[in-house]
Amino acid sequence: MVEPLLSGIVLGLIPVTLIGLFVAAYLQYRRGNQFEF
């Protein structure tokens, strides 16, 4: 009974996590270019 809900949560969280990591890396990359470290 809990497995479909759990798998749904995991399947929903994985793309959000990947997008969050990508955005964080992109912002860090932009900030690094801005200050030219």
Curated annotation (Swiss-Prot):
GO terms for molecular function: electron transporter, transferring electrons within cytochrome b6/f complex of photosystem II activity. SUPFAM superfamilies: PetG subunit of the cytochrome b6f complex. The keyword Transport applies. Its main location: plastid. It is found in: Plastid, Cyanelle thylakoid membrane. GO terms for biological process: cytochrome complex assembly; photosynthesis. Keywords: Cyanelle, Electron transport, Membrane, Photosynthesis, Plastid, Thylakoid, Transmembrane, Transmembrane helix, Transport. It is a single-pass membrane protein. The chain crosses the membrane at residues 5-25. Disulfide bonds: none annotated. The 4 large subunits of the cytochrome b6-f complex are cytochrome b6, subunit IV (17 kDa polypeptide, PetD), cytochrome f and the Rieske protein, while the 4 small subunits are PetG, PetL, PetM and PetN. The complex functions as a dimer. Component of the cytochrome b6-f complex, which mediates electron transfer between photosystem II (PSII) and photosystem I (PSI), cyclic electron flow around PSI, and state transitions. PetG is required for either the stability or assembly of the cytochrome b6-f complex. This is Cytochrome b6-f complex subunit 5. It comes from Cyanophora paradoxa.
